[in-house]
Amino acid sequence: MKHGFTLIELLVVIAIISLLMAISIPALYQAREQAKMTVVNGELHGIGLALEAYAMENEGLYPPTRADCNPWARKHTYALPQELVDSGYLPKGEIGKVRFAKIEDKYNEGCAYKYIAVGPKYDYLGAPFGNQHLYIPEGFPSYEGENLIKYNDFEVSPVTWALFSLGPRYDLQSLEEKDFPLKEGFPVSKRFWYSPQTGEGILTRIRLVNGRQIGSFESK
């Protein structure tokens, strides 16, 4: 004669299943997030190669930064430069008047990865927009002093350009209200970079003046 499960047995089974789910779900999420970051770092590496190829064809000069204070362009500020499209290195993206290299940031749906280079800056209509600057910690990258030094001349800046993804847990709503905190050392200062300990921060690839590329992809 066959007997069904008793209530106690069912409760034990449910408890075991719940325990297994509690253990496995965070691990699955972590694995998925790690895979996503691997893809992003790989794409930033590829964009870095495209920038170097562009510079080789243009007497060592890199594409200008693009930014715009108009509402229709704010979320696309510092989008990947259209020069990489014109040179055939990256696919074309266009939203309204904003034209850029289309490789979507996996952490910022509908927007490309960001690019900031010390030197000339233009708006999305092609008009000069002054010089793009970066505030870089004194001693970077060997160490980060308390003082931030403003650079707007690529010939003296220790950083040539910075590529970045918004990374996990970035406050997207803040981008609708204000610009990135450049005056605080963003995106160069390592305190803004992704940290495995906190699980948040931007994913970066930065070219130093000596040609070396560093970034959050080096984090263990």
Regions found by a protein language model. Give the residues of each.
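A short linear-motif detector with a strong N-terminal bias
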Residues: 17, 25, 33, 42, ...
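Conserved hydrophobic/amphipathic alpha-helical signal-anchor segments
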Residues: 22, 28-78
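Low-complexity, acidic interaction segments enriched in glycine
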Residues: 60-220
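Conserved aromatic-histidine-acidic binding/catalytic patches
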Residues: 16, 32, 36, 151
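N-terminal single-pass transmembrane signal-anchor helix
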Residues: 2-29
